Amino acid sequence: MLSLAEAKEKILMALSARKLVERGWLTALLGYLAKREEVEVRLKYIGDLRLQRKDFGALAILTYYATMCQPGLPEELAKTFSRSLEPRRAFSLLLASLSLASYPCRKQSTDNKVSINMSPERLSLEVNGVSVAFNPSCVYIDSLLEIFAWGEYEVPEVLSGLRGRDVIDVGANAGDTALYFILNGARKVIAVEPLPNVARCAEENVRLSSATDKVKVINAALSYEPVGVPCDYDVRLSGSFSTLKGNGPCKVPGVTLGDLINMVDDPYLIKMDCEGCEAQVILGPEREKLRAFEHIILETHPFITGVSNEKLLASLKELGFECRPHRALDPKLGQNVYHCKSLSKEFSA
């Protein structure tokens, strides 16, 4: 049950989306607050849609943040995407674009110099002279939301020391996390993604971002041996694929943590969102190599691995890391994001 304060906040954010909803806004809002699974709306320019509750909530929140610095942007984007796309695809790109656009607005920094350019062919964002761009056919919408809108990797202590440092990104998907780290000053990112077509999307997005000198995409699995994966997995669903649960006819090489560390000069951060492989790294024979990093950001998946979060955190504590919860993604499943800081690195500095 929502508290009064939470309900007021959600209503305030939903008011921002009202300018996009031609019909059904109040009914959708009441359904959203009552936690109905689906709501029906007619969006300006786009048309009639049946939205999942989370999508209506995302539209409300993203519109709220985007209008802080560009009041007319949501309507402009809806109009642009409706010209050549069917309603569902237009809505998906609207959410993706608002995710990118809301990022600098949400940070509310007057020092940010921001340029936004969204079209059905290219989604691009430039902040303080650093740009990232995505092919709309090569994006996982939920991932963009998590990274740029919800701040899944927005750990101030990590970002404040990221400039000019190196990152290993395990579970890179379509390159969105790697490009997020570049946007925040990383010098080099090694991006590991096991699904071949998703890795190609990551390469495409890195190319569009003119970041091929900073991001190296590796189509491989974190493993001691080659792994079989699907050859053509739907990018829009790829965020939930796990090499521990799925397989396929395409063989991709295995890379070890040691291999990845040897690819960078300054292992500052390792990010792991690999649907279960984090347990293999933290409890496996190369676990001591994690000491090379100053920071770890990991997403846990006990429902896949059968390994409790407590066991993983205890292992990291033995390695000299202090771990704190950053985001609770699904409390029922124990799916959380943790930030772990090396205490030995802190004291040696």
Label each PLM-derived region with a short phrase.
Residues 1-349:
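Phosphate/nucleotide-binding beta-alpha loop and adjacent structural elements of enzyme active sites
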